[in-house]
């Protein structure tokens, strides 16, 4: 099993925490949720393929994490993270 590696822009991470109340360190934990749902995000995939992951964080919050894969797919770049809306929460398995 390969180890997950993460990266993000520190300024974006700080702005995200202020706006949405979600730290990217917490958002990382969604990637180990075995029930998380991966969703393609073609509307935001101009320069690179972007995805949204809906899953539980280590703080037991249902989060939506926008991300892309870098390198040869072994680095996950977190773009944004926020609490899932009630409507989005219904899509969690």
Q: What is each stretch, according to the model?
A:
Residues 1-93:
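Ribonuclease/tRNase effector modules and their secretory precursors
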């Amino acid at each position: 099993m390969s180890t997950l590696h993460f990266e993000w822009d520190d300024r974006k991470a700080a702005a995200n925490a202020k706006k949405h109340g979600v730290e990217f360190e917490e958002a990382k934990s969604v990637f180990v949720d075995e029930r998380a749902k991966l969703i393609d995000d073609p509307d935001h995939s101009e320069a690179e393929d972007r995805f949204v992951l809906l899953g539980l964080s280590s703080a037991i919050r249902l989060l939506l994490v926008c991300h892309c894969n870098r390198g040869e797919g072994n680095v996950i770049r977190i773009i944004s993270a926020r609490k899932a809306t009630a409507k989005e929460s219904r899509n969690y398995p």
